[in-house]
Each structure stands twice: as C-alpha cells, then as structure tokens.
C-alpha cells in the first residue's frame, strides 16, 4: 500500500485515481497515492468535448489520471478534473506511477522480511529518501550501484539498509523494448491537422493505464500522409498488444471523424 505524508492532496496535484462509482452527474474515485481517499469528479470536469454518456468515458475500476481542483481541508473533501490534465502531464505521471509501484513492491517485500509494517517502510525509508534526494526509487537504484552510504546519508535506519539493497537488486529496471507500426492518415475535413490530432488523442486514452509495462507512446509524421506509431515498454507481449490496440482505435475513431487511416506496416 502507498502512504503519503499528507492526509490530503494539494490543488494542482496530478494523481492516479481508480473509478469507483459512476453517476449521471459525475463520479466518485479513490486516490491511489492517498490511501484510497475518496474524491469527486464532476460531470463538467470529465471531458472538454461534448459526451453523450459519461459511461463512454468512465468505467468502474479503471485507473485514470486526474488533477486536483478543489480541497476543503476543514471538511476533508477533494474535487478532481479529468479534462484539465494535459497530454504532457499524463505522460509524466504514467512514468512516475510506474516508479512508485516499483518502490511500493520493494518496500512491501522488505517490510515482510523484517516483520515490520509497510507504513514503517514508507516513513523510515521512502520519506527520508524523498526529503534528501527527491525521488526515492532513483536513490535506491543508485545505492545498489554505488553503495549503502546513499541510504545512510538520508537517515535510513541501519536495520533497513542491507535487506533493502538485496531486494532492490532483484528489481532493477527491466530492459526496454520498442514496437513500431506505419500508418497513412488522410482527411478532407476543414482544419484537417486539428482533426487528426483529435483522433490520435482519443485513440491513446487509457492505453498506458491498461498496459502497466508501457513507458512511452509516440505517434508522429514521417512525411505526410505517413505516420509512425512507437510503443516502448518492458514487456514485449504487452507492447505488441498495445500497438495493435492503438492502431485499431485509430482506424475506428478515424471512421467516426471522417479521417481515413490504413496500415502500411506493423
């Protein structure tokens, strides 16, 4: 379980959330980085484009990336937005979330070995490394390569140091794989470039949440009308499945938006 130093997030914070309940007027989500704290996602903050049915965008138990827009510290309530998260913020958060998950797994296993709680692990290891170095998992990986001094200098208690380094060495960052595909994209619609961007944006929605091993996705022109789709991840099977899903999404959404998309090579 992931523990945060603060009970409540701050306005503007970008977070991972799990959709719990969906209603016509909005959705309740739990904030994964705040112990499952409940937050409200209003209907007006779901999408910047008109959506007929909120359930076309939100599905229960799906993970989404949200931005905190209101915090009432007296009442302990939080409101979040889906539409205010930019593509760049979403990409960065996905990368950060993968690091957090790796950190959480290491701390879970080490705390079990020491017969201590996961909360102890977060308080005595993760939070101290965060205060000293900013990114706990990067600090741990550096300590595996350069030695325990990095942990000791941050104030990590000695009882954690050796088992932490032993476990972290088993969870070294996996080798990256890249899968690519070539497509052609054509449209006679007015504002064609904007229309193509819209199709691409829709096709990528939730892909990185659905495939946890993905690190990066890029779709870019290599000379109109040809575009390249690159998927980078640590699991070849998931990267291949994600590439196929993206291309399938592009073709389907393209038809709906009068954008002709065909596969050149996968």
Swiss-Prot record:
- What InterPro entries does the record point to? NA-bd_OB-fold, S1_domain, S1_IF2_alpha, TIF2_asu_arc, TIF2_asu_C, TIF2_asu_middle_sf, TIF_2_asu
Does the keyword RNA-binding feature in the UniProt annotation? yes
Q: Which residues form the S1 motif domain?
A: 12-83
The molecular function terms of the Gene Ontology recorded here are:
ribosome binding; RNA binding; translation initiation factor activity
SUPFAM superfamilies the UniProt entry points to: eIF-2-alpha, C-terminal domain, eIF2alpha middle domain-like, Nucleic acid-binding proteins
Keywords attached to this Swiss-Prot or TrEMBL record, sorted alphabetically, are: Initiation factor, Protein biosynthesis, RNA-binding
Q: Name one Pfam family in it.
A: EIF_2_alpha
**Cited Gene3D superfamilies:** EIF_2_alpha (3.30.70.1130), Nucleic acid-binding proteins (2.40.50.140), Translation initiation factor 2, subunit 1, domain 2 (1.10.150.190)
Q: Which GO terms describe its biological process?
A: translational initiation
Q: Could you confirm whether the keyword Amino-acid biosynthesis appears in this record?
A: no
Quote the SMART domains the UniProt record gives: S1
The text of the family note is: Belongs to the eIF-2-alpha family.
NCBIfam families (alphabetical) = PRK03987.1-1
**Function statement:** eIF-2 functions in the early steps of protein synthesis by forming a ternary complex with GTP and initiator tRNA.
- Assembly description: Heterotrimer composed of an alpha, a beta and a gamma chain.
The name under which this protein is listed is Translation initiation factor 2 subunit alpha
The species this protein belongs to is: Saccharolobus solfataricus (strain ATCC 35092 / DSM 1617 / JCM 11322 / P2)
Q: Which gene encodes it?
A: eif2a
């Amino acid at each position: 379980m992931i523990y945060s130093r603060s009970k409540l997030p701050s306005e503007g914070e970008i977070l991972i959330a799990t959709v719990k309940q969906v209603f016509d007027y909005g959705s309740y989500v739990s904030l994964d980085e705040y112990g499952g704290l409940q937050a409200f996602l209003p209907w007006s903050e779901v999408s910047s484009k008109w959506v007929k049915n909120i359930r076309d965008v939100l599905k229960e138990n799906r993970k989404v990336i949200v931005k905190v827009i209101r915090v009432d510290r007296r009442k302990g309530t939080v409101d979040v937005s889906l539409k205010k998260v930019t593509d760049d913020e979403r990409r960065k958060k996905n990368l950060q979330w993968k690091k957090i998950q790796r950190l959480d797994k290491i701390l879970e296993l080490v705390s079990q070995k020491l017969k201590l709680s996961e909360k102890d692990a977060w308080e005595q290891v993760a939070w101290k490394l965060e205060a000293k170095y900013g990114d706990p998992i990067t600090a741990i990986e550096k300590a595996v390569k350069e030695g325990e001094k990095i942990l000791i200098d941050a104030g990590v208690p000695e009882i954690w140091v050796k088992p932490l380094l032993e476990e972290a060495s088993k969870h070294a960052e996996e080798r990256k794989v890249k899968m690519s595909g070539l497509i052609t994209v054509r449209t006679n619609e007015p504002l064609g470039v904007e229309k193509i961007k819209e199709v691409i944006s829709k096709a990528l929605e939730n892909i990185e949440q659905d495939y946890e091993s993905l690190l990066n996705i890029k779709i870019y022109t290599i000379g109109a009308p040809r575009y390249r789709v690159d998927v980078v991840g640590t699991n070849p099977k998931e990267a291949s499945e994600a590439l196929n899903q993206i291309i399938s999404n592009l073709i389907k959404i393209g038809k709906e938006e009068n954008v002709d998309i065909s596969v050149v090579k996968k």
